[in-house]
C-alpha cells in the first residue's frame, strides 16, 4: 500500500507554489519531507489531505484517486501548525472528540503521552503556549490510528528536551502500531536519526527522493587550512565549500580517502547534504 503523487501542482493566481511534485509515500515507514521555509512543503501536505484543492496532478492510494475514496481519506491525518481546533475547547474535549471520530484512537497511549509531556488537559487550547499547542497536536497525531500520519513542523515552539522526547515517542507510536509517518520540517539534524527516507522539495519542485542510508554514503566532509583543503579537493567533485578566514570546510562526493596531515575527515550528515543541495546561488 502506498500513496503516489504525480505531477502535483498548485497555482495561486500567477504564482506557482508547487510546480509538478512527483514522489511515493510507502506504507509503514518514517519519511522526512525536507525543504526550506517557503519551499512548498505545507502546500503539498494540505493538498494530499485535501485542505486545499490541487490545481492539477494525481494523488492515488493503491492506484485509486485518494480524494474520490472517503474510506481512503479516513486513513490520512494531517497535523499542521494551523489552528483548526475550536479555541474554547479544553484538551480533554479534543480527546473525547477524537475517540468518537476514530474508534481505534489509542487512548491509553494518549494518556501516557499526557503524563510524560506534563499536559494540563483542563487548559483551554486558546490559553496554551505555542509549545503546548504543538504538544497537544503531537499527542492527537501519535495516538491516531490512521495509516498515514502527516506532521507539518511538529516541534514548533518546543524546547530541546521536548523535541528529543517527540522523536522517542514517535518511534514508540510506530512500534505500537506500524504505519507511515511523514515529517515535514526544515530542522533536519534533530529528526535525521529516525528517518528512513527523505523527499527534498526546493522552490516547489521535488529534487531528491532517496533513502537516508544512501545519502550518508554519497560523500564526506573535509576541513582544515584553506590551502590544504583546496589542494585536496582540486580533482574531486565538491558539493559545497565554506570558508572562514584561513579555515575551509568542503562537502565532497565520493568515498573518503586515506588520512592526510593537516586535514580532518568526517562522515556526511543528512543536514550537510540538505544544506548543500538547497542553498541558493547568492548565499
Where are these predicted regions, by residue range?
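ABC-family P-loop ATPase nucleotide-binding domains
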Residues: 71, 80-136
Amino acid at each position: 500500500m502506498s500513496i503516489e503523487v504525480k505531477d502535483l501542482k498548485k497555482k495561486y493566481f500567477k504564482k506557482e507554489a508547487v510546480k509538478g511534485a512527483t514522489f511515493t509515500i510507502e506504507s509503514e515507514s518514517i519519511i522526512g519531507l525536507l525543504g526550506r521555509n517557503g519551499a512548498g512543503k505545507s502546500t503539498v501536505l494540505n493538498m494530499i489531505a485535501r485542505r486545499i484543492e490541487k490545481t492539477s496532478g494525481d494523488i492515488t492510494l493503491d492506484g485509486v484517486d485518494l480524494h474520490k475514496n472517503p474510506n481512503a481519506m479516513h486513513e490520512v491525518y494531517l497535523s499542521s501548525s494551523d489552528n483548526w481546533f475550536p479555541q474554547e475547547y479544553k484538551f480533554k474535549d479534543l480527546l473525547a472528540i477524537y475517540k468518537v471520530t476514530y474508534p481505534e484512537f489509542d487512548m491509553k497511549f494518549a494518556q501516557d503521552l499526557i503524563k510524560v509531556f506534563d499536559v494540563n488537559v483542563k487548559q483551554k487550547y486558546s490559553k496554551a503556549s505555542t509549545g503546548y499547542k504543538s504538544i497537544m497536536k503531537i499527542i492527537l497525531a501519535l495516538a491516531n490510528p490512521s495509516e498515514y500520519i502527516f506532521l507539518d513542523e511538529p516541534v514548533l515552539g518546543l524546547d530541546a528536551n521536548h523535541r528529543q522526547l517527540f522523536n522517542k515517542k514517535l518511534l514508540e507510536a510506530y512500534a505500537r502500531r506500524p504505519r507511515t509517518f511523514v515529517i515535514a520540517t526544515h530542522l533536519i539534524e534533530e529528526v535525521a536519526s529516525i528517518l528512513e527516507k527523505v523527499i527534498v522539495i526546493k522552490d516547489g519542485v521535488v529534487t531528491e527522493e532517496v533513502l537516508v542510508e544512501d545519502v550518508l554514503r554519497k560523500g564526506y566532509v573535509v576541513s582544515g587550512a584553506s590551502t590544504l583543503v583546496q589542494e585536496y579537493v582540486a580533482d574531486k567533485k565538491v558539493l559545497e565549500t565554506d570558508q572562514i578566514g584561513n579555515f575551509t570546510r568542503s562537502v565532497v562526493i565520493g568515498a573518503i580517502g586515506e588520512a592526510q596531515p593537516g586535514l580532518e575527515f568526517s562522515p556526511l550528515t543528512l543536514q550537510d547534504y540538505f544544506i548543500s543541495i538547497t542553498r541558493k546561488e547568492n548565499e
